[in-house]
């Protein structure tokens, strides 16, 4: 994205955004409520368009958007379908049919420890289980790009910690590009290869690249990010 701008009713939510996501990279977009991070993700997903600037996709046919899976804050599972049927739901869409394989989709349930839930309905799942299923459903269409909009924010801290480890394993094993929107500094530090901070009016307020096994547990790096993030967020974390 180069010079990305977006406004709603005259209020800027993205202001001159220049950001690149490399193939296979895990990027965390960090920011307070109202910083424009969800709008940025919706633009990447094709659910919103920029008012100005450009969005370019490398190494895709004709520069088209890569095959993309999206998971929002709520799992949005179909309540009348079982977990297995929800996982297979993606094949109903023409854009996904060519890449969708039933055996692969159900294999993901086994591979990531959810096969015991296959016959359950969404109202029989915990919040953490529902979000895992939503992520597997998105992964089942074999996306090159997985977009996650604060998928763990409504869960309690213990469950969030467990799911972060699970997500890191999934992203690494499937080798997909991930953009995660979050307001949680520790979540960003644990998962991301790179952190992009959005500040007021959707401006980039900082960017940090994390080397495996080094920057993630560095208290000075965490303090630096919190300083940029702002005093209010520091209190929350």
Where are these regions (language model features)?
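Conserved beta-strand-loop-alpha-helix hinge in the C-terminal portion
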Residues: 201-227
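ABC-type ATPase nucleotide-binding domains, specifically the catalytic core motifs of the NBD
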Residues: 9, 49, 81, 85-101, ...
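A short, proline-enriched helix->beta-strand linker immediately N-terminal to the Walker B motif
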Residues: 140-144
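Conserved ABC ATPase "signature" region
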Residues: 99-117, 169
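Conserved ABC ATPase signature
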Residues: 121-125, 129
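Helix-to-loop junction immediately C-terminal to a conserved catalytic motif
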Residues: 45
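The feature captures the beta-strand-to-loop junction immediately N-terminal to the Walker
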Residues: 30-32
């Amino acid at each position: 994205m180069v010079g990305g701008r977006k406004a709603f009713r005259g209020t800027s939510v993205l202001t001159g955004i220049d950001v690149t996501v490399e193939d296979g990279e895990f990027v965390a977009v960090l920011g307070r409520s109202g910083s424009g991070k969800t709008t940025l993700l919706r633009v990447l997903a094709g659910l919103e368009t920029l008012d100005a600037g450009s969005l370019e996709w490398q190494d895709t046919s004709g520069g088209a958007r890569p095959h993309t899976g999206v998971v929002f804050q709520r799992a949005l599972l179909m309540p009348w379908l079982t977990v297995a049927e929800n996982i297979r739901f993606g094949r109903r869409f023409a854009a996904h049919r060519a890449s969708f394989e039933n055996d692969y989709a159900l294999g993901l349930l086994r591979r990531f420890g959810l096969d015991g839930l296959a016959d359950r309905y969404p109202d029989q799942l915990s919040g953490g289980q529902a979000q895992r299923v939503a992520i597997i459903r998105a992964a089942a269409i074999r996306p090159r790009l997985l977009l996650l909009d604060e998928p763990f924010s409504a869960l309690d801290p213990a469950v969030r910690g467990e799911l972060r480890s699970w997500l890191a394993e999934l992203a690494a094993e499937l080798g997909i590009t991930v953009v995660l929107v979050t307001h949680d500094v520790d979540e960003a530090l644990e998962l991301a290869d790179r952190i992009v901070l959005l500040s007021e009016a959707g401006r980039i307020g900082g960017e940090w690249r994390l080397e495996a096994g080094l920057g993630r547990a560095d208290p000075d790096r965490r303090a630096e990010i919190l300083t940029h993030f702002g005093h209010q967020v520091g209190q929350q974390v």
